[in-house]
Amino acid sequence: MTLRHALFISLVFISTACFGAETKKSSPEDFIRALYRFHQPGKDTPDWFADKQTLSKYFDKELTALFIKNYECEKREQGVGNLDFDPIYDAQDFEKETTNLRIAPAPDEPDLFNVTFTNLGTRTLVYRLTNTPSGWRISDIKYPEELSPKGNIVT
């Protein structure tokens, strides 16, 4: 085996270990941080709540299907669906920056995480996560004054 082959094989193993660990072995807190890095509605980012492939990277099968159902309703009703706010921010309006993101496990609830952030005020949402073979996925989000996405879309 030449030095080139050994170096190439080493790089493949290191890359696989690094990239695979981030997506499948990340902590729940890292998973939620990645969601907020990806989804920044105050900036010019595309609306991904109609893209099943992207949704399934962050949400479980049931919630993904409900977001797709809501999108289909919006198309039928010309923009009016059951979910009239951004479910990640519990808001309709946004600043360009989200600050003070804090994620903490809920006491005595291993699948619940309190997510606090500042964007046009400070909010705390409660995420229910499920550890799937593909990594962490959001199975629900509880808002201080409203139903969860499941409750809003189903009703």
Q: Where are the predicted features?
A:
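Bacterial N-terminal signal peptides that target proteins for export
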Residues: 1-7
